[in-house]
Amino acid sequence: MIKPGSVFSPPQTPAARCLHLVRLNPIITRSELVEATGLSQPTITRATAALLEAGLVQERTDLTRTRGRGRPTVPLEVADNKWILAGIAIGTSRTHIALFDTMGRTLREDDISTPVARLSESDFIEHIMAGVNRLTTGISRTLVSVGVTTSGNVDEDGLVWAANLGWEGVDIAARLRYQFNVPVVVSSAIPAILGSETQSADLNQTGKVLVLFADDSTGAALSTEAGVTQLVPLPRISSELLNLHDSASEDNVATQAVLDALAAREISASTLAEAATIAEDNETARGILDERAHLLASIAADLVTEHNPVTVVLAGSAFIDDPHAAKLFASSLRQHNTDAQLRLIPTHREIVRAIARAVALDPLLRVPLSLQPSTASVRS
């Protein structure tokens, strides 16, 4: 079992802390690791020895430095030990599958059509397993872990609850674990957005970061020194225009709810981008899209008041496919007197690739010495 810590928690073991720092610093010495971690010299020596034995770091003997009569200082760097880390980002209609090496470089990737809500759980998982098998074919490397991100929420038992996928308590991890005989982690896509940032942050980085994701599903997550936490449930919302009265946010500001609100007014749009185009010449459509932006700002304001983040990250088609939404959101949020900095992830592709990499690397960065090449990576 993968431990310690939950998915996207900061590195806790000496080996994990050392690997994190070696990844962030192209060349670093053991003495510098002692200083950066606050751990003792013997602890660092044991941790780096274990990482060297696992092939996760290597010594740069060509950069050996000698100072006085002491022992020579040999710097360390990340090594490529021929492992494969698979990352799977499940979307409403498409799934992104990518393979990474231990340095976080993309080896292969693919997007496959997976209209999840129209597929049985078994058929969908078969599609995913086939996709991973296709990508790993012909690579002289060994799969050591699989990470999965999905819409909705993932409970403490790893079960997925996602209305837009039609999933209620789906245990995707068990099937993948059996198929590939490697550790599998499952996370909501929303914490994974922050996970991708914490994995490249300094160990001593302070300041909370909040992410608000609005797309086919809606959610938020918060990163603190203790790790990344999905914020469930979201603050409730009310809107006369949308006939919402102290209603749950998760479904009522998702894209389908917006399209349904347009359809109720005889405005037909199959995507948010199409709705935004219609709204250029249709005041009713524009009003509904604007209301969504204001409601999202209201949700964010409540979360900022409660958690006091330094930065709010915006992600999802609500802020991308509607060209007016991000500006309206920012203006509305400022009316709530928040000083939090706003940052937008500008493309869906960037989000998908980032979360696939983050969830793929999570086991390696959290428990690097627990991953071992399987003698039977794939079951027939």
Regions found by a protein language model. Name each.
Residues 75, 85-89, 143-147, 208-213, ...:
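Short glycine-aspartate micro-motif
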Residues 1-60, 69-107, 119, 123, ...:
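ATP-binding/phosphotransfer module of carbohydrate and carboxylate kinases, centering on a glycine-rich
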Residues 109-111, 119-121, 164-168, 172-285:
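Glycine/GP-enriched mid-protein hinge/lid loop-to-helix segment characteristic of carbohydrate kinases
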Residues 146-152, 214, 312-318:
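Glycine-rich beta-strand-to-loop/alpha-helix junction loops that act as flexible
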Residues 81, 102-103, 155-156, 216, ...:
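Short, ordered coil/turn segments that flank beta-strands lining enzyme active or ligand-binding pockets
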Residues 93, 153, 191, 215-218, ...:
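Gly/Ser/Thr-rich loops at beta-strand to alpha-helix junctions
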Residues 106, 115-208, 324-335:
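Glycine-rich phosphate-binding loop and adjoining helix at the ATP-binding site
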